[in-house]
């Protein structure tokens, strides 16, 4: 279909905001930091609304020699990551101010990371997908390392950089092998090539390296080594930069690679995803039980939740053939969005408890939170219930949708494993609730925070409950977006 260039205007808005914020930060210095912050937040919100409106358009548009695609799936994912970054900026403001880190480069790097995610979501070419990945990754490496006076931050940044560079090398090597075997970098052409008589051995090696790169970006076992150390070592605000929107973008990136380009090889990569998902569910849920550091606990929570996302990705295939793929992939998409919402709320409360000379890092810091602030204790309880998959929170329906897709794919044993390991994981989520409501507070100081942050945090908590009571609108939106994207494939 003819592609009107105005479809790219929200992406251009983000790029323009980066340029304006960069110029403002360069020429005004410390005096203009608040304006840089406002530019980042407003641009993210406006772009998010624009993307959400675009998601209603069922057509697919291609740009730049089919290197970029804009469809319902891309627009919806872009809206989610844009809103996610806006909320991340708001939650982080006071935390950064208290630590003298409220600087323009933090928000500029965040915006560059957002731009990379927008490219990842809309990539229709191996090179475009890789460039988006690198733009996001390099920005995140830098933002974690900004606090140079903290040894833990520097160590976390170094680990993330070294392992991230290794994963990027895997992806690039896999792309080179797939290009050599198919003669094309465009996803549609690769799809056609691998459907024919292409060198199976070369394709297999290429797929293995691609899957390894996807697993690293999602933080799936055994490529999860960086996740607990980076979550714990980085400042909490930077942890949210890494653990929020990038996870959603990584899911969309993986779906573009595996489904839009390599679906004919699904019988091969499904086996790899089964192993990754099973290991992630086991390691994430069981290891999280022994964690006393709240950020490290949430890191293992992220690992186990990415196991559920992988379940949705692999459940679209039955015995090597596409079977009800829209339901399976939409369940993974729904789960990724729900995970972002609950992660934002969880880290929002963690940062709310932090002060200038105090980091809320251990689970004991949540003791008696209900006595200090019943509202935010309730918000944290809702987030923990959602992560544990307890009704009526939206996390329950997210897990249920993925498990249903997994059973329909004939992988009942994997669904049973997911349920059993989730019961282990529920222990450390409910332990936080127990500490907040049944233990005496260690610190009686009042909970402080600006009005905007407190308001959005309450809305965040209410959204988790509201989506749990009425999940069908979001589920339907995910299903329609996936259907519109898959309509070009000969399923």
What are the roles of these predicted feature ranges?
Residues 1-491:
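Alpha-helical transmembrane segments of multi-pass membrane proteins predominantly involved
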């Amino acid at each position: 279909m003819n592609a009107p260039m105005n479809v790219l205007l929200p992406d251009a808005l983000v790029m323009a905001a980066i340029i304006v914020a960069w110029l403002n930060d360069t020429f005004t210095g410390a005096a203009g930091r608040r304006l840089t912050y406002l530019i980042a937040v407003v641009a993210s919100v406006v772009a998010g609304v624009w993307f959400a409106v675009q998601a209603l358009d069922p057509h697919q548009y291609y740009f730049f020699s089919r290197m970029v695609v804009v469809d319902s799936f891309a627009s919806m994912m872009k809206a989610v990551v844009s809103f996610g970054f806006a909320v991340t900026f708001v939650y982080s403001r006071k935390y950064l101010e208290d630590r003298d880190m409220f600087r323009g480069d933090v928000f500029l790097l965040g915006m560059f990371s957002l731009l990379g995610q927008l490219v990842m979501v809309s990539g229709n070419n191996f090179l475009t997908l890789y460039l988006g990945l690198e733009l996001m990754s390099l920005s995140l490496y830098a933002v974690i390392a900004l606090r140079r006076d903290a040894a833990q931050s520097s160590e976390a940044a170094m680990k993330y950089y070294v392992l991230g560079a290794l994963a990027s090398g895997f992806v690039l090597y896999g792309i080179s092998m797939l290009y050599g075997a198919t003669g094309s970098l465009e996803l549609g052409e690769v799809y056609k090539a691998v459907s024919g008589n292409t060198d199976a051995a070369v394709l297999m090696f290429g797929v293995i390296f691609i899957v390894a790169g996807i697993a690293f970006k999602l933080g799936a076992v055994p490529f999860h080594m960086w996740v607990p150390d980076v979550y714990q070592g980085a400042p909490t605000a930077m942890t949210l930069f890494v653990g929020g929107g990038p996870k959603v973008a990584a899911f969309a990136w993986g779906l573009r690679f595996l489904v839009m380009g390599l679906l004919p090889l699904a019988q091969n990569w499904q086996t790899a995803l089964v192993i990754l998902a099973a290991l992630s569910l086991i390691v994430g849920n069981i290891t999280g039980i022994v964690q006393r550091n709240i950020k490290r606990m949430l890191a293992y929570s992220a690992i186990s939740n990415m196991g559920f996302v992988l379940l949705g990705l692999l459940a679209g295939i039955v015995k090597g053939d596409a079977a009800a793929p829209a339901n399976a992939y939409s369940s993974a998409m729904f789960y990724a969005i729900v995970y972002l919402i609950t992660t934002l709320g969880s880290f929002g409360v963690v940062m709310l408890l932090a002060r200038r000379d105090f980091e809320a890092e251990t689970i004991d810091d949540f003791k008696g939170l209900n006595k200090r602030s019943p509202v935010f204790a309730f918000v944290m309880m809702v987030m923990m219930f959602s992560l544990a998959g307890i009704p009526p929170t939206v996390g329950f329906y997210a897990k249920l949708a993925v498990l249903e897709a997994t059973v329909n794919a004939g992988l009942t044993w994997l669904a049973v494993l997911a349920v059993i390991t989730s019961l282990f994981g529920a222990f450390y989520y409910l332990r936080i609730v127990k500490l907040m409501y049944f233990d005496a507070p260690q610190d009686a100081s009042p909970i402080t925070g600006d009005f905007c942050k407190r308001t959005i945090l309450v809305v965040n908590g209410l959204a988790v409950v509201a989506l749990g009571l009425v999940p069908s609108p979001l589920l339907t939106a995910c299903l329609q977006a996936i259907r519109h994207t898959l309509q070009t494939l000969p399923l």
